[in-house]
Regions:
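Alpha-helical protein-protein interaction elements
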Residues: 25, 34, 67-70, 78, ...
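Interaction-surface and assembly-scaffold signal
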Residues: 2, 6-16, 20-23, 119-256
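N-terminal domain-onset segments
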Residues: 1-88, 225-227, 232-234, 240-256
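Generic structural signal for short, solvent-exposed loop/turn connectors between secondary structure elements
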Residues: 51-52, 58-69, 95-101, 139-141, ...
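Aromatic- and glycine-enriched beta-alpha-beta binding-site module
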Residues: 75-154
Length: 256
């Protein structure tokens, strides 16, 4: 991996070690990407304490004059990507600035070195390595038609662990995410990387229990607890190449 992408802004103390950096090769899978996945998503509105924690992990040029409105957690199994299948967990913060919404990613962890490098070099996403463990069916739960257990996972890295357990409804409905909400990341030189993902698939209502054992820099704002969310299957995601110009989102990122 190009060393300029090793120090991207993200959660302190949950990053890449010098040994990990030296072992990573440069990405050979440039954007855009078209991928197929299965994803479990949930959200919460941050309280005052969580907003203070978000302020500590989102770079000032991104959060200037903006208010965190929503934190979205996602546990994703990528079934098909340019670098092969892999797993990912992430937390996305949706901000509002002057009536406009945008999102940014302070935390993302994967079990694929190639996926890690591509995420950093293509979109300036602060991906870090993690191990994923299948938790199976919750203890004592009856087998029910339509209940999905293969997204019950524990995800861990040095000094942190997140556990997600879920049950889902039985009726899938069409789901579509249009390429409207911009994601704004800062590149290694502070330049804005701006892109608008889109997705379509099928979704089912999910009930989740999310437990976080991590340093305060992650624990205090990650959407933990009992949540209602959605399980997305047969999910087709498009990740376009970012723009790096001073367009609308870039100008907004620089406002003071």
């Amino acid at each position: 991996m190009r060393r300029t992408f090793a120090g991207l802004a993200g959660v302190p103390d949950i990053g890449l070690s010098p040994e990990e950096i030296s072992a990573l090769s440069e990405s050979r899978s440039p954007a855009p990407w078209a991928v197929r996945a299965r994803a479990l998503c949930w959200a919460r509105r941050p309280d005052a304490s969580a907003r203070r924690a978000i302020e500590a992990v989102v770079p000032e040029p991104v959060r200037a004059n903006a208010t965190p409105e929503l934190v979205v957690g996602a546990l994703i199994h990528y079934e098909s990507t340019p670098v092969g299948p892999y797993d990912e967990i992430t937390a996305v913060v949706v901000h509002r600035r002057a009536g406009t919404l945008f999102a940014t990613v302070p935390f993302m962890a994967v079990d694929s070195p190639a996926g890690l490098v591509a995420g950093r070099e293509n979109w300036a996403l602060p991906k870090t390595p993690a191990e994923f463990e299948d938790l199976g069916r919750p203890h004592g739960e009856q087998e029910l038609s339509g209940t999905v257990h293969d997204m019950n996972r524990a995800v861990a890295g040095p000094g942190w662990r997140i556990e997600v357990e879920t049950t889902t409804g039985r009726i899938p409905l069409p789901a579509y995410v249009p390429p409207v909400l911009p994601l704004l990341q800062l590149g290694p030189g502070g330049e804005p990387f701006i892109f608008r993902p889109s997705a379509h698939g099928r979704g089912r209502r999910a009930r989740l229990s999310v437990r976080v054992d991590a340093p305060p820099a992650l624990r205090d704002w990650f959407p933990a607890g009992r949540r209602t969310g959605v399980l997305l299957t047969d999910l087709h995601i498009r990740l376009p190449a970012p723009t790096r110009s001073t367009g609308e989102a870039g100008r907004a990122a620089r406002r003071r």
